[in-house]
Every structure is written in C-alpha cells, then in structure tokens.
C-alpha cells in the first residue's frame, strides 16, 4: 500500500464522517404515521364506496359499466329490478386485493354511485377479507355530489308514476315554454 492510497482512503473516511455529521442534525423526512396524519392530495384515489341519492335510495342502477371499465376485472355485480321498475344490483362485489385504484370505475359510472374516497387504510391479514360486498361498500350519504339524482336528471319515469311524481322529486321543467 502506497502513501497515496493511504491518503485517499483516509480522505474518503473523513468525507463520509463529515456527511454523517451534517445529516445527523437535519429534520427527518420520515413521518411517524400513526401519530402524525398523512397529507393526501384532494383528488387522492383510495377506498371505493357506493353512495345513495338525496332520497336515500341506492344510486347504482346495475348498468355494469364499472365492471367493463375495470382493467383488472375486480368488480362483479348482478342486476335485479324493483317493482317500480328501477334497477339495482342484487349483489355488488369488489375484490380489493386485485384493485389498482385507477378510478376508471368512478369515471364510467353514469349515476355517480361509485366514488373513491381518500381512505387508504385497508390492511387485512386474510385475502378473503379484502373482498367487499354491497353491504360493506354502501354508505348512508350522497358522497361528493349531494344534489345529483340520476332518475331526476335523466327524466326517466318510474312505473306507476309520471315524471315528477316520485317521492321528493320536482316536476320536470317545460323548456319549450322558455323559448322566445
């Protein structure tokens, strides 16, 4: 070992200790997660929920667009029909162990029934516990769009009732009467 190699080796050791000394007193970048809340951006895509319309009814009309739009095929549902003619999902299942939280199901939903919330704490010990049924996904409120009602906006009538005669539904506006 030559003197030059010895000096270079000693210099790298001193430089390493200098860098350690500099970074030892800097503010830590690691967040202590459970104690400190995590900042999430406003449009963060986390847990998927099913919402209700302002009347308290299920928004999902079992159109199957969410299942078709899902790139990994983690959504499955079966359509059924109420006596008044409204469709609803007999069962609605999402396998969160396969879900990539891309948000395509939310974009495809015409009734805004599927919404992604900023909740990300979904850790389970068993893979079977990550398969959520409709009862697990359905929340009591309307979610991000509190005033939107698919049947009212689309102008669809319900069997046995004219447009605007359903519970908590306003009569349709005659737009032709507004023209000059």
From Swiss-Prot:
This is NADH-quinone oxidoreductase subunit I. Residues 50-80, 90-119 form the 4Fe-4S ferredoxin-type domain. GO terms for cellular component: plasma membrane. The keyword Protein biosynthesis does not apply. It is an enzyme of class 7 (translocase). GO terms for biological process: aerobic respiration. Keywords: 4Fe-4S, Cell inner membrane, Cell membrane, Iron, Iron-sulfur, Membrane, Metal-binding, NAD, Quinone, Repeat, Translocase, Ubiquinone. One of its GO terms (molecular function) is iron ion binding. The gene is nuoI. It comes from Yersinia enterocolitica serotype O:8 / biotype 1B (strain NCTC 13174 / 8081). Its EC number is 7.1.1.-. [4Fe-4S] cluster 1 binds at residues 60, 63, 66, 109. Binds 2 [4Fe-4S] clusters per subunit. Transmembrane segments: none annotated. It is a peripheral membrane protein.
């Amino acid at each position: 070992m030559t003197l030059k190699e010895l000096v270079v080796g000693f210099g790298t050791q001193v430089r390493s200790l200098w860098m350690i000394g500099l970074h030892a007193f800097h503010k830590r970048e690691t967040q202590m997660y459970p104690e400190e809340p995590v900042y999430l951006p406003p449009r963060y895509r986390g847990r998927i929920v099913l919402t209700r319309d302002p009347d308290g009814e299920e928004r999902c009309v079992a159109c199957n667009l969410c299942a078709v739009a899902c790139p990994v095929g983690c959504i499955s549902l079966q359509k059924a029909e109420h006596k008044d003619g409204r469709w609803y999902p007999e069962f609605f299942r999402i396998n969160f162990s396969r879900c990539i939280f891309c948000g395509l199901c939310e974009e495809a939903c015409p009734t805004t029934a599927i919404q992604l919330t900023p909740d990300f704490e979904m850790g389970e010990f068993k893979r079977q516990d990550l398969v959520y049924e409709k009862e697990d996904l359905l929340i009591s409120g309307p979610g991000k769009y509190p005033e939107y009602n698919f049947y009212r906006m689309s102008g669809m009538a319900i069997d046995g009732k004219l447009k605007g005669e359903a519970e908590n539904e306003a009569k349709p506006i005659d737009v032709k009467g507004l023209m000059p």
